[in-house]
Amino acid sequence: PMVTGDIKDGSLGFDYKWNMGWMHDFLEYVKRDPYFRKYNHNRLTFGMTYAYSEKFILVLSHDEVVHLKCSMLGKMPGEYEDKFANLKVAYTFMMGHPGKKLLFMGQDFGQWSEWSEKRSLDWYLLGEPEHKGLWAYFKALLHIYRKYPACYALDQYPEGFFWINADDGDRSIYSFVRCSEDGKDNLLFVCNFTPVARPDYMVGVPQAGKYTLILDSSMKGQHIYTAVHTECDRQPYAVKYPLPAYGTAVFKFSKHTAKATKKAKKHK
């Protein structure tokens, strides 16, 4: 504790702290067979109980892809294609979660081998469709992160995040909202960590109106959905969306009823 706070308050005064607890829970969850993930559902929700105690970096460093720990792609369960789908949904959850991000080189396109300082990355893998697809998807995630301040502006403030459904362990689906400072272009994230498609999936939303799908795991482009007045996930409205196996969805919307009112303070 007190690593990144103000020195006047007895803190060490660092800008950020690696969130090793989150890293451990995250990796323990994503490497499990999807059938057993429902028994470990709280591993991905627990981090929010202390997310504002420090200024955190969500870190997947070189130390997690060496010494027989496997690369990120190698950690994923399932057959060949399942591993890529698992990694996409894992990275989506990570990019939506409060905290700055650190991902070691080569993990964005699915390096198979562990990292070694004695050789270069396996760039030739980008010539294979699955690796190129993973790289393109991660690039799209980075584009969203850079374009929409909701992803980062209120990282250190509770006003910047709220769960839609943190308790859907039986289906291993997580949904949450990242809020902007002015209530514009808030982002709704949905992550399905199982190989089970949910064609009639409904996610609760805080208000009526349009919800624009700006990214999903199929990479089919934007689509606008209209919320219906049906209570879902303890929210007054809902959006129906055909959630694929290992599916992800990121929607943008504005002026939600619980928009952030507290401005982020400048770090001194």
Task: Give short role names for the model-derived ranges.
Residues 1-77, 81-84, 88-89, 96:
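Glycan-recognition surfaces
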